[in-house]
């Protein structure tokens, strides 16, 4: 007998991946340079030279038995210490290596965080629009995902919609700032209000409600925006991070979980992660890559192209009359479609070789996502196709 649950999931293939596959197939027909693929959030800039140099140096000058050997169950101590020191310096925290667990990307960090603070049957509350993979992450841990409807005017938290979803069975609240797909970063005021609410709700329900903060886009911030660090606002915070975007190394699958030193049972979180790894098979990430990122915590890829692309695309969308919130960061923008059915809108866009992702799977019907992590020249060239699309299908012309 096979696991029917996973077989059933075969019919729920990622919409993002489906549209990306359409782009690839269409590109084989007409040349990929003629397909304006805004589907997939894959970094489009190279990793920093320091990362390449670190890998080369480690491969050439480190004892291969050590370099390619197993790391400790709780991951590489020197990498954990370096991450803790970096976070302390940047955000005024007091982490030690004992509060850091290296993971296979932010997905691995989230898998561990959910199992650290919740037991099957409890619920996790998040906010639309949200990354669609949160649903299998949460349900795979035996939990229920509750989704707060979006506040579309600015994509900050609608507390009147959020509060009724939190009850005695809520284990954690899951946030993503800057957000995929909206690009919005939660303000300090929003985070303080969220922290105050969670303190009160924890007291009311008689147990700590954790905040799980998913932060893979932290370094991609625009216009000098300071992205507030959620763990500064709420003690019971587990931070989940990936280097995929900041270092442009998504295929290396490297990130970490950071447990706020003041959270409940802080000293137990990282050892618990070691035990969770045993149960899930989500064992330590590559020893080589742990050592490499340890040397690169103060650098990023050249992320400026994303802000350039965002400004170009935002101005074009506004000129075409789209309703759109200007992103604070990430490499996504999330406009309102020109009809209520965003799926139909995105299907029509494909006739003009535009690959756009409907917002339904992000918990926000009627909107669509554009991942502008592509060449700036291609962003500019896509405008002619976008203008033809909205003129032919909706009678909209550039203002």
Locate the predicted segments by residue:
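PLP-dependent class I/II
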Residues: 1-19, 27-61, 74, 78, ...
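Pre-Walker A segment
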Residues: 66-67
